[in-house]
């Protein structure tokens, strides 16, 4: 949250499984489309929040499986844990708030003899969440009985049923909705209330997100039965909540456009040749640079001199690239080498994307852009911490020129091929 000096232009609060992440999309195209849009347009002045039922353990597993961005804020374990930044620093104030009228030991004791409840794996049992599986047929009866038992023991709890099988027992003050309300209150108290907030979900445990006053909401097209039922009973006349016609992250992009919250055309949906941006937008320039790089290697653009010439036009004739082991090469020589790599990743489930993009102004017409450059081929991941120097050149057809690229491997994500990423 500290990255912004003022209010976020847009705060997106999204569930992960079957909302931001489409597990039926093997190419992860909608997720990559959203990532390119966010890094290109929103990353510098907006906040990305992931709100998931997953525990930290399962959340980190998902990050190793899918090409996800690094969020500014992560809400996990059905709204019982709030953390900040890549380091995932916990919110101690939220922990203290949840301790009111909560005793995990009593919950475990009272549920031990309920035969219909089956404990989920140990990683899903958290300080303020006890999680079970329960058959859909007996769910409502179990919820009613368990609520009465825990109330008699002096606890104030919330029981959430979602996905047709998951039952979570939480403190009454917990949940995705309360966590979002807490964040909005915290941002407002710092004088930084978001200009707009978009909540995104697909299942019953996301309904609370749409109940927060002033929040826009999108149920993705593949939303589950329990969320659609909640919508028909509680929100069908609310113009701030829509049921998208697109699945998962594509539905989120659709909602940004529907509510007029900002641009919603992903750089991955923009055809080459690119239209000159005036003034230059460094984030957009970098994202498009690597989208085109990926498309060249996947043979998704024509094998044309116009593509390699574009790369040369936007790089300085004397510019250099320093590869992770320290090898220094001419940018133009690297582009010549790229020419021979056309289609070398065709049919190989290869993707390249940028994450954690940060821009620093250098003089009146220069920028230093830092980001993580990820490349994925099959199930092999590599990542370079990348710095790119870029200057405005309004007199040129593209409007800017890259003078320097410096790359180092992210620990644990190096490649045996030192120049595997070429640029």
From Swiss-Prot:
Q: Which domain of life is it from?
A: Eukaryota
Q: Which UniProt keywords apply?
A: Hydrolase, Magnesium
Q: How is its activity regulated?
A: Inactivated by zinc.
- Biological process GO terms, please? sucrose biosynthetic process
- Annotated disulfide bonds: none
Cofactors named for this entry: Mg(2+)
Gene Ontology MF term list: magnesium ion binding; sucrose-phosphate phosphatase activity
Catalysed reaction(s)?
sucrose 6(F)-phosphate + H2O = sucrose + phosphate
Q: State which pathway it belongs to.
A: Glycan biosynthesis; sucrose biosynthesis; sucrose from D-fructose 6-phosphate and UDP-alpha-D-glucose: step 2/2
Q: Which InterPro entries match?
A: HAD-like_sf, HAD-SF_hydro_IIB, HAD_sf, NTF2-like_dom_sf, SPP-like_dom, SPP_C, Sucrose_Phosphatase, Sucrose_phosphatase_pln/cyn
**What does the PTM comment of the record read?**
The N-terminus is blocked.
E.C. no? 3.1.3.24
What is its biological role?
A: Catalyzes the final step of sucrose synthesis. Inactive with fructose 6-phosphate as substrate.
Q: Which family does it belong to?
A: Belongs to the sucrose phosphatase family.
Q: Which NCBIfam families does UniProt cross-reference here?
A: HAD-SF-IIB (TIGR01484), SPP-subfamily (TIGR01482), SPP_plant-cyano (TIGR01485)
- Subunit record text: Homodimer.
Annotated protein name in UniProt: Sucrose-phosphatase 2
Please name the source species.
Oryza sativa subsp. japonica
Organism lineage string:
Eukaryota, Viridiplantae, Streptophyta, Embryophyta, Tracheophyta
């Amino acid at each position: 949250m500290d990255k912004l000096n003022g209010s976020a232009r847009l705060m997106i609060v999204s569930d992960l499984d079957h909302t931001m992440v489409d597990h039926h999309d093997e190419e992860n195209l909608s997720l990559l489309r959203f990532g390119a849009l966010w890094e290109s347009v929103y990353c510098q002045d907006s906040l990305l929040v992931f709100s998931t039922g997953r525990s930290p353990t399962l959340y980190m597993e998902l990050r190793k499986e899918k090409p996800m961005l690094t969020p500014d804020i992560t809400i996990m374990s059905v709204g019982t844990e709030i953390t900040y930044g890549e380091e995932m620093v916990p919110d101690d104030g939220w922990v203290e708030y949840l301790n009111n009228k909560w005793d995990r030991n009593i919950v475990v004791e009272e549920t031990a003899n309920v035969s219909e409840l089956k404990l989920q794996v140990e990683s899903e049992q958290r300080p303020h969440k006890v999680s079970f599986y329960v058959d859909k047929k007996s769910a409502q009866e179990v919820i009613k009985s368990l609520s009465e038992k825990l109330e008699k023991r002096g606890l104030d709890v919330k029981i959430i049923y979602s996905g047709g099988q998951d039952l979570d027992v939480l403190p009454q003050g917990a949940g995705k909705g309360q966590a979002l309300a807490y964040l909005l209150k915290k941002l407002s108290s710092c004088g930084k209330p978001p200009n707009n907030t978009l909540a995104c979900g697909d299942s019953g445990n996301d309904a609370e997100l749409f109940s927060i006053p002033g929040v826009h909401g999108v149920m993705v097209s593949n939303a589950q039965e329990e969320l659609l039922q909640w919508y028909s009973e509680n929100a069908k006349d609310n113009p701030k909540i829509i049921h998208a016609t697109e699945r998962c992250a594509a539905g989120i992009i659709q909602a940004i456009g529907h509510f007029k919250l900002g641009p919603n055309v992903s750089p991955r949906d923009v055809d080459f040749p690119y239209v000159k941006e005036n003034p230059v937008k460094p984030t957009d320039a970098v994202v498009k640079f690597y989208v085109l790089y990926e498309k060249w290697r996947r043979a998704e653009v024509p094998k044309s001199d116009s593509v390699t010439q574009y790369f040369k036009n936007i790089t300085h004739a004397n510019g250099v690239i320093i590869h992770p082991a320290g090898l220094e090469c001419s940018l133009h020589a690297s582009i010549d080498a790229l020419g021979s790599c056309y289609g070398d990743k065709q049919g190989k489930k290869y993707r390249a994307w940028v994450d954690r993009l940060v821009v620093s102004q250098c003089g009146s017409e220069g920028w230093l852009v830092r980001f993580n450059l990820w490349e994925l081929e099959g199930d092999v991941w590599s990542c370079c911490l990348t710095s790119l120097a870029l200057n405005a050149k309004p007199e040129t057809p593209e409007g800017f020129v890259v003078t320097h690229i410096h790359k180092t491997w992210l620990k644990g994500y190096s490649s045996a091929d030192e120049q595997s990423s070429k640029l």
